[in-house]
Amino acid sequence: MKESIAKVYRKTGETEIKSEINLYGEGKYDIKTGIGFFDHMLNLMARHGLIDVKLEAKGDLQVDSHHTVEDVGIVLGESFKKALGDKKGIKRYGTSFVPMDEALASLSIDISGRPYIVCDFNFTVDKLGEMDTELVEEFLRALAFNAGITIHARVLYGKNNHHMIEAVFKALGRALREAVDRDERINGVMSTKGTL
């Protein structure tokens, strides 16, 4: 499988982020956001998606983790969009159900060029480490809107919030891997319109 590499750099008054991804990698990762729990989740996404991710973020963590998490979603979304290029030959859709002990999450992706997000999470704690659990949805929204993809994510059940969020990020990686997979039978893009 050929490489599909993208580099993105973004600097604002709140964050400075640089990333490099290879959509058809081996799941290697070197991720430093300053938010330990978030790094752990992004590592899982990369590993289970077989996406190589190098990412370094410096943010205003003295305020809280919101800007950093959201802006990482923006940068990764831009990276995915750039790495996908013309989208010719990709399967377009990906769905994954991932169990993590007592928790089960599902996540579906459509690389449609039409950003949309639906999340159904019922986390029972406000924070895990230094990350607010509500930022899981903020990250996914930023990713979807900047990559131009639709994401439907749901935690079907679970008791341990770490397990629930871990299942979501593993499912994200696996769904991305399925959606960007290329099929030589697909002539052009997977759409009757001829464009995504």
UniProtKB/Swiss-Prot annotation:
Coiled-coil region(s): none
Gene Ontology CC entries for this record: cytoplasm
TM spans (from-to): none
Main location: cytoplasm
Catalytic activity: D-erythro-1-(imidazol-4-yl)glycerol 3-phosphate = 3-(imidazol-4-yl)-2-oxopropyl phosphate + H2O
Pathway in which the depicted protein is active: Amino-acid biosynthesis; L-histidine biosynthesis; L-histidine from 5-phospho-alpha-D-ribose 1-diphosphate: step 6/9
Gene3D superfamilies to which the protein is assigned, alphabetical: Imidazole glycerol phosphate dehydratase, domain 1 (3.30.230.40)
Record's subcellular location: Cytoplasm
Matches recorded under InterPro entries: IGPD_sf, ImidazoleglycerolP_deHydtase, ImidazoleglycerP_deHydtase_CS, Ribosomal_Su5_D2-typ_SF
GO biological process: L-histidine biosynthetic process
Domain of life: Bacteria
GO MF: imidazoleglycerol-phosphate dehydratase activity
UniProt cross-references to HAMAP family, sorted A to Z: HisB
Name of the protein this chain belongs to: Imidazoleglycerol-phosphate dehydratase
Organism listed in the record: Clostridium botulinum (strain Okra / Type B1)
Gene coding for it: hisB
